Swiss-Prot record:
Site (Important for inhibition by glutamine) location in chain: 62
Impact noted for substituting residue 253 to D: In strain: PCI 219
GO molecular function term, any single one: glutamine binding
Protein's name in the database: Glutamine synthetase
Role this protein plays: Glutamine synthetase (GS) is an unusual multitasking protein that functions as an enzyme, a transcription coregulator, and a chaperone in ammonium assimilation and in the regulation of genes involved in nitrogen metabolism. It catalyzes the ATP-dependent biosynthesis of glutamine from glutamate and ammonia. Feedback-inhibited GlnA interacts with and regulates the activity of the transcriptional regulator TnrA. During nitrogen limitation, TnrA is in its DNA-binding active state and turns on the transcription of genes required for nitrogen assimilation.
Source species of the chain: Bacillus subtilis (strain 168)
Positions annotated to bind L-glutamate: 240-241, 298, 304, 316, 335
Cell compartment(s), UniProt: Cytoplasm
């Protein structure tokens, strides 16, 4: 049931002096886009009559089929806490529809709903996500452009005066709470200038909406503090990168399908099949969960990011960890995902991988309770531990050869995603980087 009715929204915008409405959506690369309308056009928006040119959006449609419609999700209505000069701004997150009234297959949000329908057909009622997005704060220069100077030199769980981002982080939390977020914790992360704010899990679509809103709020409030917030996975060499650990759980009629108090580790057969599916498809879905050239600079040994496909209930070196909580809180934590990922697409491939394990009753390998980082290559091979792709190019090749993952995106999204990412890789591959000049200019 919607949090607001149409009548509630029309009343609120008058009472709160809302002057503009943002109709937001997400493109294939995970970038937030919007069409902004004056409040006088609210009725038109609520009638699903607002059009936009889909050919101008990365991965949408060709110019000869460009008309698309924005259908606002009333559940996502919120008034931004910060006020513009001429009045308040509210927003809806929208689904994209074709002119004939059918969902647009290139809309990442619609795609996640399609995979959730497949989940429901298997008898499950809910798929929850608890994300842990990390970000860096850099100083701005006098022109308002980002610099490479970090805001502080703090470390894990530091506090002021070492943690100079504390006030900015607090303001972000307050703004998020005003927008309906339930914030569980916030703290300084391992690297200098790195931060994490954890918010409560929610259903799959709502949680992905929250991730997109979170990124927008973090960047907006950081700029008010003279800072630039980035969710780039590895902005600096020699320090930890930013991840977005994803805590996943399946429910059946209000009961956590991953929990069985009488089973080994109190993990149900459903949970073990789900883990097996994640393990089987990990090297393929990495192209979506870690979608940039820079993502693979994070997935290297020594910086607490997973490089190897394994699972454990005890240690944090594998791809998959099972946190200690049980009962309704039983969950599978996938640790490779980074915050550059399009959350709707990332969750689509993660759910599809897990469901494939459940449908085919795949057997999970034995858990690995040793520190994988110190194991030799031979030891890893003996234990059936494979490496995650080392580059975006490797990840794309793995992805293209996996039928389950291709179907998880659907033909339209798959083709446009691959096209965009192969162009990105080729641009990187042919670029001459500063390291090369430093290494070779004098030597040769």
């Amino acid at each position: 049931m919607a949090k607001y009715t149409r009548e509630d929204i029309e009343k609120l915008v008058k009472e709160e002096n809302v002057k503009y409405i943002r109709l937001q959506f997400t493109d294939i690369l995970g970038t937030i886009k919007n069409v902004e309308i004056p409040v006088s056009q609210l009725g038109k928006a609520l009638d699903n009559k607002v059009m936009f040119d889909g050919s101008s959006i990365e991965g949408f449609v060709r110019i000869e089929e460009s008309d698309m419609y924005l259908y606002p999700d009333l559940n996502t209505f919120v008034i931004f806490p910060w006020t513009a000069e001429k009045g308040k701004v509210a927003r809806f997150i929208c689904d994209i529809y074709n002119p004939d009234g059918t969902p647009f297959e290139g809309d990442p949000r619609n795609n996640l709903k399609r995979i959730l329908k497949e989940m429901e057909d298997l008898g499950f009622s809910d798929f929850n996500l608890g994300p842990e997005p990390e970000f860096f704060l850099f100083k701005l220069d006098e022109k308002g452009e980002p610099t490479l100077e970090l805001n502080d030199k703090g470390g894990y769980f530091d506090l002021a005066p070492t943690d100079l981002g504390e006030n900015c982080r607090r303001d972000i939390v307050l703004e998020l709470e005003e927008m309906g977020f339930e914030i569980e914790a916030s703290h300084h992360e391992v690297a200098p200038g790195q931060h994490e704010i954890d918010f409560k899990y929610a259903g799959a679509v709502r949680s992905c909406d929250d991730i997109q809103t979170f990124k927008l709020v973090v960047k907006t409030i950081a700029r008010k503090h003279g800072l630039h917030a980035t969710f780039m996975p590895k902005p600096l060499f020699g320090v930890n990168g930013s991840g977005m650990h994803c805590n996943l759980s399946l429910f059946k009629n209000g009961v956590n399908a991953f929990f069985d108090e009488n089973a080994d580790l109190q993990l149900s057969e459903t949970a073990k099949h789900f883990i097996a599916g994640i393990v089987k498809h990990a090297t393929s879905f990495t192209a979506v969960t870690n979608p940039t050239v820079n993502s693979y600079k994070r997935l290297v040994p020594g910086y607490e990011a997973p490089c190897y496909v394994a699972w454990s209930a005890q240690n944090r070196s594998p791809l998959i960890r099972i946190p200690a909580s049980r009962g309704i809180s039983t969950r599978v934590e996938v640790r490779s995902v980074d915050p550059a990922a399009n959350p709707y697409l990332a969750l689509s491939v993660l759910l599809a991988a897990g469901l494939d394990g459940i449908k085919n009753k795949l057997e999970a390998p034995a858990p690995i309770d040793r520190n994988i980082y110190v194991m030799s290559k031979e030891e890893r091979m003996e234990n059936g531990i494979v490496d995650l792709p080392a580059t975006l190019a490797e990840a794309l090749e793995e992805f293209k050869s996996n039928e389950v993952m291709v179907k998880a995106l659907g033909e339209h999204l798959f083709e446009h995603f691959i096209e965009a990412k192969e162009i990105e890789w080729d641009m990187f591959r042919t670029q001459v980087h500063p390291w090369e000049r430093e290494q070779y200019m004098s030597q040769y």
